[in-house]
Amino acid sequence: MAEAHQAVAFQFTVTPDGIDLRLSHEALRQIYLSGLHSWKKKFIRFKNGIITGVYPASPSSWLIVVVGVMTTMYAKIDPSLGIIAKINRTLETANCMSSQTKNVVSGVLFGTGLWVALIVTMRYSLKVLLSYHGWMFTEHGKMSRATKIWMGMVKIFSGRKPMLYSFQTSLPRLPVPAVKDTVNRYLQSVRPLMKEEDFKRMTALAQDFAVGLGPRLQWYLKLKSWWATNYVSDWWEEYIYLRGRGPLMVNSNYYAMDLLYILPTHIQAARAGNAIHAILLYRRKLDREEIKPIRLLGSTIPLCSAQWERMFNTSRIPGEETDTIQHMRDSKHIVVYHRGRYFKVWLYHDGRLLKPREMEQQMQRILDNTSEPQPGEARLAALTAGDRVPWARCRQAYFGRGKNKQSLDAVEKAAFFVTLDETEEGYRSEDPDTSMDSYAKSLLHGRCYDRWFDKSFTFVVFKNGKMGLNAEHSWADAPIVAHLWEYVMSIDSLQLGYAEDGHCKGDINPNIPYPTRLQWDIPGECQEVIETSLNTANLLANDVDFHSFPFVAFGKGIIKKCRTSPDAFVQLALQLAHYKDMGKFCLTYEASMTRLFREGRTETVRSCTTESCDFVRAMVDPAQTVEQRLKLFKLASEKHQHMYRLAMTGSGIDRHLFCLYVVSKYLAVESPFLKEVLSEPWRLSTSQTPQQQVELFDLENNPEYVSSGGGFGPVADDGYGVSYILVGENLINFHISSKFSCPETDSHRFGRHLKEAMTDIITLFGLSSNSKK
């Protein structure tokens, strides 16, 4: 164990001749390089803090302003309207300065004050400009002169070369809608789903709330919105995510898949080496705030970047009543799971990141390790897959001291978690349905004990070289993880690449210490809890009916020819498919985002509208003409786009009602209206995965590098979860989930109805997959 000896910086022994002191120069060198690395990161954070703190100005602009002020002073011009003279008189009390020094100090102080005032003015002006959302409601492709002038003003006040968090202080706060507006929009959303007598009863409850308890709750909510940076996000994180006592696996965590058709190497360790290195390059860019903030409308309107902060070095810690999120400023290791064993792998050597070939070497060492799991070790992660309360109690009882605490700390404080899976997964052209379904289920839950579901994300590499992610949901939403994942897939295949033999490029380094086995001492009582959690998780995992498939008949390229939003098109297809599948309409959830506002997360678009129901009925009514159906489609798609825009601009329904409900609980008052609203099940939960957030390659020039997207488990026991990604111009990937235990649902049947619905709608426009119109 030479590497163990190298880890000891010095040793001493007492002999009859005195103390024998031995120094390990290599260990001392590594300690020095590690300390140097830490100080470099601290300096970069300090520098970035200054740059972000003065944005949209720059530190160098301070010198320009001060020099300008001093120049005018020496030209006998007073730019301060007497302020410099007042500062000078104040400095006369300090007898240690000459008259010339006082003039210089006065000029510098005034220049600094003027510079700060300019920064505040620019920042506030940008916030006012970004509070305008009229551009969102203009017809696509038609921009008014006023909007163009507004865009020009935004660009002027946005500064140059923004860093990731540069716009945070300039983003407006999420507005609180009027209670009556939210109530009216809610009633409009449930009108097509309720019988007449039920709707009358709900209308009475809603109107009573709007004039009675609602305004009182609204007053407290507005008070919070003035004090907090976002009146929704902290409560959403706590009450929707962290206070949930059920399993995270399937119910909350979601997954991301690899490239659909491309497999750059079949060597598991090589794929892991390249991808882990790419992930760490992304983390370095994140630490340095070099990731470009996402901007809409031609890279003009910034979105909030707050969710990036906890991407790495983060773990969800179980509690009996509520979980907490533990985030470390830095982590220099990852933990790798393989064949029931846990290994700690250091990410740095000689003060630098391990190169891809060196990381491959470390992964291969783990794969070649023939040691057996310790008692209770193999299925330990099942604790993170089961109910939260048993895991919290078990953690407190058995992991609070000794080697168990040290090993658990290593897992929870790791940069992220890695699983070297023993199975082969991925798309197979000879059996696309079975292969994609198996791939999705493996990433969603695996064997229930080979992913650490509490980590911000678990990176999974399969035996054949395919890879994927399983992400915990509380710390951020899917678009943030999708941004990382796009970067990793791009860097892995198109920049790092592989040698002809499939290995990572570069050379191995025999001087790098071997990965370290984590040591556990898991008593029998704890192993019983592990088995109980595993049984709970297995029941949940085995109940998931998953169907993932690429829809290749057409994509958004042809949908655009219909002069409608591709998202609206897919949502109406989902409504038609659900009606064909179930023979009825249901409350539908589509995830939108509120990141136009500071610390914004998500909002719900209620996609099942009166207009969409009219369109679906027309589609299944043979008496309706194509012209009538097209007219209803246009009305339904326009209504959907309007609802989506309202959600994005802070005028959604569900987050406002949720926060009013939380206030009512704090005040210990009951609201029959809010109680009924928040108990309504979402039997169709949908989400679109964003694509091409990272400008590293062009899909038109690299059409084979298409992503499979990602998915999630069913939200309701008797409903469907549907995720979709519009890839390039010619492909849409769908991920459909439901539960076998529900006799009414069938994911494959829904998939067939969805394909039919997509084809039926495109046929209305006289278009097809081979259309040249």
UniProtKB/Swiss-Prot annotation:
GO cellular component, one term: mitochondrion
Regulation: Inhibited by malonyl-CoA.
GO molecular function: carnitine O-palmitoyltransferase activity; identical protein binding; protein-macromolecule adaptor activity
Modified residues (N-acetylalanine): 2
Pathway field: Lipid metabolism; fatty acid beta-oxidation
Tissue expression as described in the entry: Strong expression in kidney and heart, and lower in liver and skeletal muscle.
GO biological process terms held by the UniProt record: aflatoxin metabolic process; carnitine metabolic process; carnitine shuttle; cellular response to fatty acid; eating behavior; epithelial cell differentiation; fatty acid beta-oxidation; fatty acid metabolic process
Active site residues of this protein: 473
InterPro entries: Carn_acyl_trans (IPR000542), CAT-like_dom_sf (IPR023213), Cho/carn_acyl_trans (IPR039551), Cho/carn_acyl_trans_2 (IPR042231), CPT_N (IPR032476)
Protein's UniProt keywords contain S-adenosyl-L-methionine: no
Residues annotated as binding (R)-carnitine: 589, 602
EC number: 2.3.1.21, 2.3.1.-
TM segment ranges: 48-73, 103-122
Modified residue annotations for 3'-nitrotyrosine: 282, 589
Binding site for CoA: 555-567
Membrane-related topology note: Multi-pass membrane protein
Description of what induces expression: Up-regulated by fatty acids.
Subcellular location, record wording: Mitochondrion outer membrane
Variant or mutagenesis effect after changing residue 360 to G: In CPT1AD; reduced protein levels
Mitochondrial intermembrane domain ranges by topology: 74-102
UniProt comment concerning the protein's domains: A conformation change in the N-terminal region spanning the first 42 residues plays an important role in the regulation of enzyme activity by malonyl-CoA.
Subunit structure: Homohexamer and homotrimer. Identified in a complex that contains at least CPT1A, ACSL1 and VDAC1. Also identified in complexes with ACSL1 and VDAC2 and VDAC3. Interacts with ZDHHC4.
Family to which the UniProt record says this protein belongs: Belongs to the carnitine/choline acetyltransferase family.
Protein name per the record: Carnitine O-palmitoyltransferase 1, liver isoform
